[in-house]
Amino acid sequence: MMDWNNKNVVYVGGFSGFGYQVCQMMMKKPMKHLIVCSRMENVEMLKKLQAINTSVKVMFVQMNIADYASIVKGVKQVIGHVGHVDVLINGVGGLADKDVETTVAVNLTGLINTTLMFMPYMDKTQSGHGGMVVSISSVYGLEPGPAFSVYSAAKHGGIGFTRSMADEHLYHKTGVAFMCICPAMTSTELMMNKRDMNWMKWVPHSEEMWKMVMDAKMQTPEECAVNMMTAMEQAKNGAIYICSTSGMKEITPTVYMH
């Protein structure tokens, strides 16, 4: 089970949706620091987080994970403040298939670069104490997403990265557990902004598929956050969880080579 006591937690993500809801829930834990890394600062949201628990120091570091130099600068600032990281939550996501490079950068390469740059400050054989990396993916990282194939491909890649980093040999060396959380359809700002079908017209034959996606029953960010916290509390290396209106469920991907 996860021990939150005196931990330095880094959340890389925005100030809306289930990621921010998770931050609110984590603030009730006996952490030492919560550092929010995002492209834009939201002073009011940071104040609301701090008000939940004045014993946990809330900090903000600007970081754009689609920009390698910004990640380098952001990680340096974080480590300058706290020295090491115990929990890293990769919570950035972007659904904009028309912009292939940005979609891949936000959902895959940014996640990889951010994780690898923080690893020396988590790895117990280097400057860290061990810990946990939690990457927020999507059910469309587990199954095809024909209405948004680029997004789906990037999320598949993120899960592949997580599973590879969770290798037992690496885990025993570094002390860093890796897990992935895959929310099902959630009524976040990311999804609600896509109700205008015009944005999908550049993808041939996608309108009907996208309508089916948007007509599906969605969980609220609050429901998703509760399930995510339950999953994180398990602190199980290599675990992949689906969070949906049905609750939280651990899944086991097929292994083809032994």
Swiss-Prot record:
Gene3D superfamilies assigned to the protein according to its UniProt record, in alphabetical order: NAD(P)-binding Rossmann-like Domain (3.40.50.720)
Active site location: 151
Entries under CDD domains matching the protein: ADH_SDR_c_like
Sequence similarity: Belongs to the short-chain dehydrogenases/reductases (SDR) family.
Pfam families for the chain: adh_short
GO CC annotation: cytoplasm
List of residues binding NAD(+): 10-34
Keywords: Oxidoreductase
Domain of life: Eukaryota
Coiled coil: none
PROSITE patterns for the chain: ADH_SHORT
Molecular functions per Gene Ontology: alcohol dehydrogenase (NAD+) activity
Species: Sarcophaga peregrina (Flesh fly)
Record-annotated membrane-spanning stretches: none
Record: residues binding substrate: 138
Annotated protein name in UniProt: Development-specific 25 kDa protein
